[in-house]
Design a protein with these regions (language model features):
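Short, solvent-exposed polar/charged micro-motifs at secondary-structure junctions
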Residues: 10-15, 115-117, 157
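Charged phosphate-binding loop/patch that engages nucleotide di/tri-phosphates or the phosphate backbone
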Residues: 157-173
């Protein structure tokens, strides 16, 4: 089982969204519904195992919908069951992934038929694993704040954070 989700990577304070010139043409303005926040920057999409090991990540502009990054994110993924949040709720995506051999589970909205049976608390608890990983990355490495001024610097910072985080899963004697 693998879990996918995304988090914002703002490059400036919200008051400067329309004046920002860093990463012009690459970053743009997006909305994060869980934080009720408009931000200028990127979105980092991650694929994580149940134990919290980061398998893959993709960086997109802030306005790119989560569904558009799924195929890049899961390419080469060995896990066949993928848990996601409401941002990935789509029949077309579910059908596309089924043809590739993946089973996509997303919770249903509360007003949808069968939501109480479908949204099992154990699956929801498993899905929260990735939220915990994002919190740890923010606490340990301050991943949501970047001082990178070029794409190479941004990529290097993210690679270093993922490497350092994943190395914590191995015991060195």
């Amino acid at each position: 089982i693998a879990i996918i989700d995304s988090f914002p990577l703002p490059l400036c304070q919200p008051v400067r969204n329309h004046r920002a010139s860093i990463f012009k043409g690459k970053a743009d303005i997006g909305y994060n519904a869980s934080k009720h926040l408009w931000f200028y920057g990127f979105k980092v999409h991650m694929l994580v195992t149940l134990s919290g090991y980061i398998l893959n990540y993709v960086v997109t502009a802030a306005s790119v919908h989560d569904i558009r990054a799924v195929h890049d994110l899961i390419s080469g993924c060995q896990q066949s069951v993928i848990l996601a949040d409401l941002g990935y709720l789509s029949h077309e995506l579910k059908d596309d992934l089924a043809q590739e051999g993946y089973v996509l589970w997303t919770p249903l909205r509360q007003n949808m038929v069968g939501a109480r049976r479908h949204n099992h608390w154990k699956l929801m608890a498993m899905r929260r694993t990735i939220e915990t990983r994002f919190s740890e990355l923010a606490r340990l490495f301050d991943i949501e704040h970047t001082l990178a001024r070029g794409l190479t610097g941004l990529q290097l910072r993210l690679e270093q954070i993922v490497l350092a985080y994943n190395l914590s899963y191995f015991e060195f004697n």
